[in-house]
């Protein structure tokens, strides 16, 4: 009986080398004062206004080092370590209209376990049209002999790590966010990316919302990009999540079947 190798990957983010012009939330947590997400957000905004073209070589250097670590360890599908991002969520948001990174809003998160000031949603969310994924993917893939996996945050996770001052309707907000994610995915597909990970750890924390919004996310994020392998990443801490993953698989198959039938017709 022929054995099939189980392919390996990493979740996504890696610590940033100190020579980079940015730090992320978790890098700041390693400092003496602990995690300071507000400071990191403000500093990244300032960096965006004053970044240099020469910084690109530093990002490529960091990505190359991080990819090499994974390849040397035998990882089949490496990531670039998300080295261009201040965290795995807000980098996507910075490419959308509707977000305010200048006037942050205070919020209490994680069932009261954490409080901070977050970027605010002050108008309708839509993509600016300046897609980041093609450049980031091509730059990283050029450094790897194996296929690079690209990571994008899911709508629920974005919603839980930003301050909604406009929608007051989680379903509408989720729909608009899902549309921006789908646009980035389409551009990744055009560039030849074959492994895309949608990060949705909030599925496990907000199971009711996951049930309410998951089918819409499947339609807007997954089904429109059938030519690639897309993984939904979450932390299964609720027994309902285990049941829901079975439903997701069934819904994906149904959506694919309906999509193909409609294409034939």
Label every model-predicted segment.
Residues 1-265:
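Domain-level signal for soluble alpha/beta catalytic cores
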């Amino acid at each position: 009986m022929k054995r099939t190798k189980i392919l390996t990957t990493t979740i996504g983010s890696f610590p940033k080398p100190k020579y980079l012009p940015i730090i992320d939330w978790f890098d700041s947590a390693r400092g003496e004062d602990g995690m300071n997400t507000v400071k990191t957000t403000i500093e990244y905004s300032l960096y965006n206004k004053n970044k240099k073209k020469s910084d690109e070589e530093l990002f490529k250097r960091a990505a190359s080092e991080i990819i090499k670590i994974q390849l040397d360890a035998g990882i089949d599908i490496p990531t670039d370590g998300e080295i261009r991002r201040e965290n795995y969520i807000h980098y996507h948001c910075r490419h959308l209209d509707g977000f305010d990174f200048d006037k942050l809003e205070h919020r209490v998160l994680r069932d009261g376990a954490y409080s901070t000031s977050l970027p605010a949603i002050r108008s309708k969310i839509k993509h600016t049209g300046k897609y980041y994924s093609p450049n980031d993917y091509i730059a990283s893939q050029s450094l790897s002999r194996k296929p690079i996996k690209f990571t994008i945050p899911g709508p629920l996770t974005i919603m839980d790590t930003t301050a909604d001052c406009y929608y007051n309707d989680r379903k509408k907000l989720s729909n608009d966010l899902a549309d921006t994610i789908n646009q980035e995915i389409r551009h990744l597909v055009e560039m030849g990316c074959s492994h895309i990970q949608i990060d949705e750890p909030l599925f496990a924390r907000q199971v009711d919302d996951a049930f309410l919004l998951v089918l819409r996310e499947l339609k807007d994020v997954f089904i429109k990009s059938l030519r690639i392998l897309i993984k939904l990443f979450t932390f299964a801490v609720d027994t309902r999540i285990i049941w829901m993953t079975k439903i997701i698989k069934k819904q994906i198959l149904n959506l694919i079947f309906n999509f193909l039938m409609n294409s034939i017709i």
